[in-house]
Amino acid sequence: NIVGEMIDIRDNVVKSNSVNYQSLIGEFVHLNNSNTLIINGGRVTTEPKHNLVIRLDLDKKELCLSRPAFRKFLTEENNVTPKQWLFQMTQSGAKIVEKRKKMAANWKPGLDQFNVDAYILDTSTINKTILEVIDSELT
């Protein structure tokens, strides 16, 4: 009988901490605003002030997130697994690729030779308010 009650609670109680997976991108971008490189028209419009964690390429409609930094953000700060986040995002129609990326390309000579593991998101498939966190003029 106790097991039945537990199952009933699990199935019928509204979860108070349901996760908005798209908003996690916005939160990560907001936390790392000073770690963002923005490229527009092949030119740097915003340079990171600290470690390069995010690259936004407006012409290519790509938002690149450093995979190690984003995974740490998901697991340690939000208790969400990267696999769970990726699944939910693709279910919502977001196009995301996991691959190695030259995050510093077109920025500083020498640094652009190094690839890092990244999540590359097609910005035309994600909520536009995420980009507003970076710069309201981008949307």
List each model region and its residues.
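Extended alpha-helical interface modules used as scaffolds for assembling large macromolecular complexes
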Residues: 1-139
